[in-house]
Amino acid sequence: AYVINDSCIACGACKPECPVNIQQGSIYAIDADSCIDCGSCASVCPVGAPNPED
């Protein structure tokens, strides 16, 4: 699963790319149980906030 770290600027670039609906807030969040590891969020993020969970 991907997780979004504290460098998230909530720009919204990832939201339309995510097939499992990233949750919007002051920092965006990905539901680890729903994430399908597609990496679409990471490929469009301007600050590199989404990363594969260890």
UniProtKB/Swiss-Prot annotation:
Function: Ferredoxins are iron-sulfur proteins that transfer electrons in a wide variety of metabolic reactions.
Binding residue positions for [4Fe-4S] cluster 1: 8, 11, 14, 45
A single MF term (Gene Ontology): metal ion binding
Cofactor(s) required, per the database record: [4Fe-4S] cluster
Protein name per Swiss-Prot or TrEMBL: Ferredoxin
Cofactor note: Binds 2 [4Fe-4S] clusters.
InterPro entries: 4Fe4S_Fe-S-bd, 4Fe4S_Fe_S_CS, PSI_iron-sulfur_center
Binding site for [4Fe-4S] cluster 2: 18, 35, 38, 41
Keyword terms: 4Fe-4S, Electron transport, Iron, Iron-sulfur, Metal-binding, Repeat, Transport
Originating species: Peptoniphilus asaccharolyticus (Peptostreptococcus asaccharolyticus)
Gene3D superfamilies in the cross-refs: 3.30.70.20
Residue ranges constituting the 4Fe-4S ferredoxin-type domain according to the UniProt record: 2-25, 26-54
Superkingdom of the source species: Bacteria
Pfam families referenced in this protein's UniProt entry, alphabetically: Fer4
